[in-house]
Protein backbone atom coordinates (compact mmCIF):
# COMPACT_ATOMS: atom_id res chain seq x y z
CA UNK A 1 0.00 0.00 0.00
CA UNK A 2 1.28 3.43 -0.87
CA UNK A 3 -0.61 6.63 -0.08
CA UNK A 4 0.38 10.19 -0.84
CA UNK A 5 -0.97 13.71 -0.61
CA UNK A 6 -0.07 16.57 -2.91
CA UNK A 7 0.55 19.98 -1.37
CA UNK A 8 -0.04 22.84 -3.78
CA UNK A 9 2.90 24.82 -2.36
CA UNK A 10 5.46 22.24 -3.47
CA UNK A 11 7.66 23.00 -6.43
CA UNK A 12 7.56 20.61 -9.35
CA UNK A 13 8.22 21.38 -13.00
CA UNK A 14 6.22 18.79 -14.91
CA UNK A 15 7.85 19.54 -18.26
CA UNK A 16 11.40 19.26 -16.91
CA UNK A 17 10.54 16.47 -14.49
CA UNK A 18 12.35 18.28 -11.70
CA UNK A 19 11.33 19.04 -8.15
CA UNK A 20 9.16 17.18 -5.65
CA UNK A 21 5.43 16.89 -6.34
CA UNK A 22 4.79 14.92 -3.13
CA UNK A 23 6.30 15.14 0.34
CA UNK A 24 3.79 13.11 2.30
CA UNK A 25 4.07 9.35 1.94
CA UNK A 26 2.60 6.51 3.98
CA UNK A 27 3.65 2.89 3.55
CA UNK A 28 2.05 -0.27 4.86
CA UNK A 29 1.18 -3.89 4.20
CA UNK A 30 -1.35 -6.45 5.41
CA UNK A 31 -1.86 -10.22 5.35
CA UNK A 32 -5.03 -12.16 6.12
CA UNK A 33 -5.72 -15.84 6.74
CA UNK A 34 -9.28 -17.10 6.26
CA UNK A 35 -11.23 -20.32 6.56
CA UNK A 36 -14.13 -21.16 4.25
CA UNK A 37 -17.04 -23.52 4.87
CA UNK A 38 -17.42 -25.31 1.52
CA UNK A 39 -21.04 -26.25 2.28
CA UNK A 40 -22.41 -22.85 3.31
CA UNK A 41 -19.99 -20.34 1.75
CA UNK A 42 -19.46 -18.71 5.14
CA UNK A 43 -15.95 -17.57 5.96
CA UNK A 44 -14.05 -16.74 9.13
CA UNK A 45 -11.08 -14.40 9.27
CA UNK A 46 -8.57 -16.30 11.39
CA UNK A 47 -5.59 -13.94 11.44
CA UNK A 48 -4.69 -10.48 10.21
CA UNK A 49 -1.26 -8.90 10.36
CA UNK A 50 -0.91 -5.20 9.50
CA UNK A 51 2.22 -3.06 9.35
CA UNK A 52 1.57 0.68 9.00
CA UNK A 53 3.93 3.64 8.97
CA UNK A 54 2.72 6.27 11.44
CA UNK A 55 5.47 8.86 11.35
CA UNK A 56 5.64 10.28 14.87
CA UNK A 57 2.47 8.87 16.42
CA UNK A 58 0.56 11.41 18.50
CA UNK A 59 -1.40 8.70 20.35
CA UNK A 60 -0.69 5.02 19.70
CA UNK A 61 -4.05 3.82 21.09
CA UNK A 62 -6.02 6.18 18.85
CA UNK A 63 -3.84 5.26 15.88
CA UNK A 64 -4.42 1.54 16.52
CA UNK A 65 -8.17 2.16 16.70
CA UNK A 66 -8.12 4.10 13.43
CA UNK A 67 -6.17 1.33 11.68
CA UNK A 68 -8.49 -1.39 13.01
CA UNK A 69 -11.60 0.64 12.16
CA UNK A 70 -10.50 1.33 8.59
CA UNK A 71 -9.60 -2.34 8.15
CA UNK A 72 -13.00 -3.56 9.42
CA UNK A 73 -14.90 -1.03 7.29
CA UNK A 74 -12.99 -2.09 4.19
CA UNK A 75 -13.38 -5.78 5.04
CA UNK A 76 -17.15 -5.17 5.16
CA UNK A 77 -17.14 -3.60 1.72
CA UNK A 78 -15.19 -6.60 0.42
CA UNK A 79 -17.21 -9.38 2.06
CA UNK A 80 -20.75 -8.43 3.01
CA UNK A 81 -21.89 -4.95 1.97
CA UNK A 82 -23.76 -5.85 -1.19
CA UNK A 83 -25.89 -3.33 -3.12
CA UNK A 84 -28.35 -5.35 -5.23
CA UNK A 85 -30.64 -3.48 -7.62
CA UNK A 86 -33.93 -4.35 -9.26
CA UNK A 87 -34.52 -4.27 -13.03
CA UNK A 88 -35.24 -0.51 -12.84
CA UNK A 89 -31.91 0.18 -11.15
CA UNK A 90 -33.35 0.92 -7.71
CA UNK A 91 -31.39 -0.31 -4.71
CA UNK A 92 -32.95 -3.22 -2.85
CA UNK A 93 -30.77 -3.00 0.29
CA UNK A 94 -32.04 0.28 1.74
CA UNK A 95 -32.65 -0.50 5.41
CA UNK A 96 -30.52 -1.83 8.27
CA UNK A 97 -32.31 -5.17 7.91
CA UNK A 98 -31.36 -5.57 4.23
CA UNK A 99 -27.90 -3.96 4.11
CA UNK A 100 -25.41 -6.17 5.93
CA UNK A 101 -22.43 -4.59 7.68
CA UNK A 102 -19.71 -6.33 9.69
CA UNK A 103 -20.64 -7.31 13.23
CA UNK A 104 -18.61 -8.51 16.21
CA UNK A 105 -18.99 -12.03 14.81
CA UNK A 106 -17.12 -10.98 11.65
CA UNK A 107 -14.05 -9.62 13.45
CA UNK A 108 -10.76 -11.45 12.93
CA UNK A 109 -10.00 -13.98 15.66
CA UNK A 110 -6.46 -12.61 15.87
CA UNK A 111 -5.38 -9.18 14.64
CA UNK A 112 -1.83 -7.90 15.05
CA UNK A 113 -0.86 -4.35 14.18
CA UNK A 114 2.70 -3.12 14.05
CA UNK A 115 3.10 0.63 13.80
CA UNK A 116 6.39 1.85 12.38
CA UNK A 117 7.55 5.20 13.70
CA UNK A 118 9.50 6.65 10.81
CA UNK A 119 9.63 10.29 11.71
CA UNK A 120 8.80 12.88 9.11
CA UNK A 121 11.20 15.37 7.61
CA UNK A 122 8.41 17.35 5.94
CA UNK A 123 5.73 19.59 7.35
CA UNK A 124 2.94 17.76 9.13
CA UNK A 125 1.46 18.07 12.60
CA UNK A 126 4.33 17.08 14.92
CA UNK A 127 5.65 14.73 12.23
CA UNK A 128 2.56 12.49 12.27
CA UNK A 129 1.27 10.70 9.18
CA UNK A 130 -2.15 9.65 7.84
CA UNK A 131 -3.87 7.03 9.98
CA UNK A 132 -7.60 7.18 9.15
CA UNK A 133 -7.85 6.69 5.40
CA UNK A 134 -4.78 4.79 4.11
CA UNK A 135 -5.45 1.62 6.19
CA UNK A 136 -8.77 1.27 4.36
CA UNK A 137 -6.95 -0.62 1.59
CA UNK A 138 -5.91 -3.39 4.00
CA UNK A 139 -9.41 -4.94 4.03
CA UNK A 140 -8.84 -6.11 0.47
CA UNK A 141 -6.49 -8.74 1.87
CA UNK A 142 -9.52 -10.62 3.20
CA UNK A 143 -11.12 -10.74 -0.27
CA UNK A 144 -7.84 -11.93 -1.81
CA UNK A 145 -7.40 -14.55 0.93
CA UNK A 146 -10.92 -15.86 0.24
CA UNK A 147 -10.22 -15.90 -3.50
CA UNK A 148 -6.94 -17.78 -2.96
CA UNK A 149 -8.64 -20.31 -0.68
CA UNK A 150 -11.31 -20.95 -3.32
CA UNK A 151 -8.69 -21.24 -6.08
CA UNK A 152 -6.80 -23.85 -4.05
CA UNK A 153 -9.94 -25.99 -4.37
CA UNK A 154 -11.22 -24.78 -7.78
CA UNK A 155 -8.30 -23.28 -9.77
CA UNK A 156 -10.53 -21.70 -12.45
CA UNK A 157 -12.94 -20.11 -9.95
CA UNK A 158 -14.00 -16.49 -10.36
CA UNK A 159 -15.03 -14.70 -7.17
CA UNK A 160 -17.27 -11.68 -7.49
CA UNK A 161 -17.12 -8.64 -5.26
CA UNK A 162 -18.23 -8.56 -2.45
CA UNK A 163 -17.37 -12.09 -1.34
CA UNK A 164 -20.74 -12.92 0.24
CA UNK A 165 -21.53 -16.55 1.12
CA UNK A 166 -23.59 -16.74 -2.08
CA UNK A 167 -20.67 -15.41 -4.17
CA UNK A 168 -18.31 -17.91 -2.53
CA UNK A 169 -20.67 -20.81 -3.29
CA UNK A 170 -21.07 -19.65 -6.91
CA UNK A 171 -17.28 -19.51 -7.30
CA UNK A 172 -16.98 -23.02 -5.86
CA UNK A 173 -19.60 -24.26 -8.35
CA UNK A 174 -17.35 -23.35 -11.30
CA UNK A 175 -15.67 -26.73 -10.87
CA UNK A 176 -18.84 -28.42 -12.17
CA UNK A 177 -18.78 -26.26 -15.30
CA UNK A 178 -15.34 -27.58 -16.24
CA UNK A 179 -15.88 -31.31 -15.50
Residue ranges with predicted function:
Residues 1-179:
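C-terminal catalytic domains of large/alpha subunits in multi-subunit enzymes
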